[in-house]
């Protein structure tokens, strides 16, 4: 998988996994604020960005991540949305490499029956949406600041029916790391939908050593809305597993 690195490799490493339909640039400003203290690595997940040639499956993606973890040794992992779902499964499979993790806006496994309906009736819509329309819809829907328009426009070039179906399929294969020893912070934006908030409650109910928190006034992709706060939340959790004072405990 394609990756971008920032910061001194002698420092502790944080692996960043972006949301569906985005790419590594989602984390650019967050990484900038963390790079003095951490070695930051943002990947392009399969069928996204510069990893568009790699098939997107849960098994394949987590295997790629396992190789990346082994390369760096002990790592922290941060994932948003699709990236958060993959983080959960990676934590289940490769807990020995993960010192701590932060996930945001993540759902747990979707039912196969529901995904069949989504793949039949929702995914084909992406066949007729032009990239420039997708950019506009994403920026408006996620309240992404205008300074990110170029990055969103590039990411939207990869969005198609096959990618969307692959993402839906991946979300049927999430494995919860129930016997978890790595501190896990499960975050949701205050403006997230109920599906995400129910998943947040389910994850923290079943996964040991996990904690939930709400980000006030934040939406789904709040790494764009407030990269400084996102960086501070990550830093506090990675260093001493404390929840940022701005967040509301659940």
Where do the model's predicted regions map?
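Gly/Ala-rich beta-loop-alpha elbow adjacent to hydrolase catalytic centers
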Residues: 79-83, 87
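Conserved serine/cysteine hydrolase catalytic core
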Residues: 166-205, 211-214
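Flexible "cap/lid" loop of the alpha/beta hydrolase fold
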Residues: 88-93, 97-128
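Alpha/beta-hydrolase fold catalytic core
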Residues: 1-15, 35-39, 70, 143, ...
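Conserved HGGG/HGGXW glycine-rich cap/lid loop of the alpha/beta-hydrolase fold
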Residues: 5-50
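Active-site loop/oxyanion-hole signature of alpha/beta-hydrolase fold enzymes
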Residues: 28, 32, 41-78, 232
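Conserved alpha/beta-hydrolase catalytic His-Asp/Glu region
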Residues: 112-114, 128-179
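Catalytic histidine-centered segment of alpha/beta-hydrolase-like enzymes
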Residues: 218-231
């Amino acid at each position: 998988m394609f990756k971008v690195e920032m910061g001194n490799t002698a420092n502790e490493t944080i692996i960043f996994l972006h949301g569906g339909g985005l790419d590594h640039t989602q984390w650019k400003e967050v990484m900038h604020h963390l790079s003095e203290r951490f070695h930051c690595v943002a990947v392009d997940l399969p069928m996204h960005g510069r990893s568009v040639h790699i098939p997107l499956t849960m098994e394949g993606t987590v295997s790629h991540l396992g190789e990346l973890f082994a390369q760096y040794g002990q790592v922290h992992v941060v994932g948003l949305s699709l990236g958060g779902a993959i983080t959960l499964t990676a934590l289940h499979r490769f807990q020995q490499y993960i010192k701590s993790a932060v996930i945001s806006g993540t759902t747990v496994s979707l039912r196969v029956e529901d995904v069949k309906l989504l793949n039949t009736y929702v995914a084909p819509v992406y066949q007729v949406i032009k990239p420039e329309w997708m950019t506009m819809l994403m920026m408006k829907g996620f309240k992404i600041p205008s300074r990110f328009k170029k990055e969103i426009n590039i990411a939207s070039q990869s969005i198609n029916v096959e990618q969307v179906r692959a993402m839906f399929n991946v979300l049927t294969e999430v494995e919860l790391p129930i016997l978890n020893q790595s501190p896990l912070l499960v975050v949701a934006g205050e403006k997230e939908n109920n599906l995400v908030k129910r998943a947040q409650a389910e994850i923290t109910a079943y996964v040991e050593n996990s904690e939930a928190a709400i980000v006030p006034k934040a939406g789904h992709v709040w790494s764009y809305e407030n990269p400084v706060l996102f960086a501070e939340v990550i830093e506090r959790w990675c260093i001493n597993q404390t929840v940022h004072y701005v967040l509301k405990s659940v």
